[in-house]
């Protein structure tokens, strides 16, 4: 939608406005509006906007809470199973039901397959194109020349002698590695369907557990595919390490691209059935037993790993969003089940009333709200870093996870992969990086693929132990209460995911899901704090060699895509005519845009 960025007093007259709307090779409708200082080669200003309205929190009201997994999975056509899983966790708490261990291991296996599938296809078939030969040649021919001369340090592991060979292998559709990654995505999708029935809207997930019929053959079929993926990881991790390390060497200062203050959120993933009873009063304890540790990370340090603290600190701010304020609306929850006060800005108390209007970057400009985490003094604009960097950072720093295949050390995560068809045992170690930036977000995605594969090996072993012991039940009965307050915490592929439920008279009175997109894509809030996309792009240096006339914005795109943006389609709304100051480039990759 056309729009004009606001003018400011004393603004440099040589700033060039450049807009990318929609951003390609992501999911959904995301626009990035910038002002670029080509003289000093940096982004001076950035606004992130989405032209879609999601109405799930409205039409969930009055529904049977047992239907919430099936309804919420339709929020997204990419990570719908993450929503379904989180809804199951939420209703388990509301109904007071504890699923059998085998059911939990099956859910963990399904979610592990989802991480492997989605991170793989995004890393090497979507964001990977930003680093392919075609893109580098067009934007940084000097870097391409260096790549042709640069030996790949781990060529023996991945088979590509020069860095330029890796870039060529990432070319869309023609690249060898690009095509290989597509094949692996098919395998991992099959793995998911073995556990949860259908991708991406599970047919077997249900409050109380899962309806999958567990047999040794099902786990054998899963494991056969998993071992192929494990072998693939032994190639993928060193390949990406070589590629990303090269960019630091070829472009000194590239660590500043997409860099922001380390403010990371991770809500934890993969429940441990030996500890998780889904009771709110014990949530802090069983949350710490997850196989990905929940945490809020501020300036690189863990400030809490308690899901109760995480829940109570959530605030949904407005400021630049197209919604009515609900400060004086109904208060659904005054205290949590432990007696702690609950703020009116908490998702339990949110009332969603859309207020469509013309996009105005000086006022309201997006349908995304501004979730913040209140630490008692500041409303922190946490990001997920696309998911993996927050998960690995939180798990590494806490040092709680140790399952043999994966071990958190306090400063790193060790990933131990067993012998496969053609490769021996391999140990990878992800170390907490110096920065939260574009390159490190992308690097973490690769390591978390390996982490997920290693965790899946452990989950398979645990599931088979249940089978061999004769404990084959996967679901527990429950009764829907007349009144309940509940929440569920999980990690969607792209990061933090929480569902917040209030039941009255046996029906849903209020339901608010908070996936990673509102956290990452949030706009400036009532205090003027920019959201993570905006913050990461603002002041990012420009390394692209093209001038304004042929500018593609590859550094900006790398910064944005490193978050793995996902703004799936809801209700599309056109909000006025506006005026285009100047659009220099719209990256449609060969497609002709019809006006």
Enumerate the language-model features and the residues they cover.
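Metal/cofactor-centered catalytic core regions of large enzymes
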Residues: 2-595
């Amino acid at each position: 939608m056309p729009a004009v960025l606001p003018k400011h007093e004393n603004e440099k007259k040589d700033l060039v406005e450049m807009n990318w709307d929609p951003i390609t090779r992501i999911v959904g409708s995301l626009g990035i509006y910038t002002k670029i200082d080509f003289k000093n080669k940096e982004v001076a200003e950035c606004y992130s906007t989405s032209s879609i309205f999601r109405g799930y929190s409205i039409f969930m009201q009055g529904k049977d809470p047992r239907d919430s997994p099936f309804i919420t999975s339709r929020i997204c056509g990419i990570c719908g199973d993450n929503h379904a899983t989180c809804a199951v966790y939420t209703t388990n708490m509301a109904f007071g039901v504890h699923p059998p261990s085998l059911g939990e291991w099956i859910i963990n296996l399904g979610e592990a397959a989802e991480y492997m599938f989605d991170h793989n296809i995004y890393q090497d078939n979507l964001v990977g194109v930003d680093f392919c030969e075609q893109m580098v040649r067009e934007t940084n021919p000097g870097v391409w020349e260096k790549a042709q001369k640069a030996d790949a340090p781990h060529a023996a592991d991945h088979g590509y002698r020069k860095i330029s060979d890796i870039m060529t292998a990432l070319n869309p559709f023609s690249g060898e590695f690009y095509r290989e990654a597509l094949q692996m995505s098919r395998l991992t999708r099959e793995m998911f369907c073995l556990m949860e029935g259908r991708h991406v809207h599970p047919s077997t997930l249900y409050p109380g557990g899962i309806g999958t019929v567990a047999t040794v053959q099902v786990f054998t079929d899963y494991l056969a595919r998993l071992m192929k993926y494990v072998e693939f990881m032994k190639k993928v991790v060193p390949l990406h390490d070589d590629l990303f390390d090269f960019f630091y060497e070829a472009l000194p200062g590239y660590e500043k691209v997409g860099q922001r203050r380390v403010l990371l959120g991770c809500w934890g993933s993969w429940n441990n059935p030996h500890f998780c009873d889904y009771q709110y009063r014990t949530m802090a304890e069983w949350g710490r037993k997850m196989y990905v540790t929940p945490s809020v990370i501020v300036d690189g340090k863990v400030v809490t790993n308690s899901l109760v603290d995480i829940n109570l600190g959530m605030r949904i701010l407005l400021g630049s969003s197209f919604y009515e304020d609900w400060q004086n609306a109904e208060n659904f929850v005054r205290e949590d089940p432990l007696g702690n006060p609950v703020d009116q800005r908490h998702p339990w108390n949110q009332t969603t009333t859309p207020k469509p209007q013309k996009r105005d970057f000086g006022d309201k400009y997006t349908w995304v709200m501004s979730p913040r985490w209140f630490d008692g003094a500041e409303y922190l604009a946490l990001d997920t870093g696309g998911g993996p960097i927050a998960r690995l950072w939180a798990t590494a720093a806490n040092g709680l996870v140790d399952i043999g295949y994966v071990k958190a050390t306090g400063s790193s995560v060790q990933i131990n992969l067993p012998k496969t068809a053609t490769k021996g045992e391999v140990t990878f170690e992800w170390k907490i990086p110096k920065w939260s930036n574009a390159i490190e977000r992308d690097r973490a995605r690769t390591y978390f693929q390996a982490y997920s594969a290693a965790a899946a090996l452990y989950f398979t072993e645990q599931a088979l132990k249940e089978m061999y012991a004769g404990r084959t039940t996967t679901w527990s009965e429950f009764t829907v209460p007349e009144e309940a307050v509940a929440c569920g915490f999980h990690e969607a592929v792209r990061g933090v995911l929480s569902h917040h439920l209030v039941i009255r008279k046996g029906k849903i009175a209020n339901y608010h899901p908070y996936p990673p997109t509102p956290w990452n894509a949030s706009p400036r809030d009532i205090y003027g704090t920019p959201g993570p996309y905006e913050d990461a792009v603002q002041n990012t240096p420009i390394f692209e060699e093209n001038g304004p006339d042929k500018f593609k914005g590859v550094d900006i795109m790398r910064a944005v895509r490193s978050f793995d943006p996902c703004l799936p389609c809801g209700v599309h709304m056109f909000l006025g005519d506006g005026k285009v100051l100047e659009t220099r480039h719209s990256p449609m990759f060969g497609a002709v845009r019809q006006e």
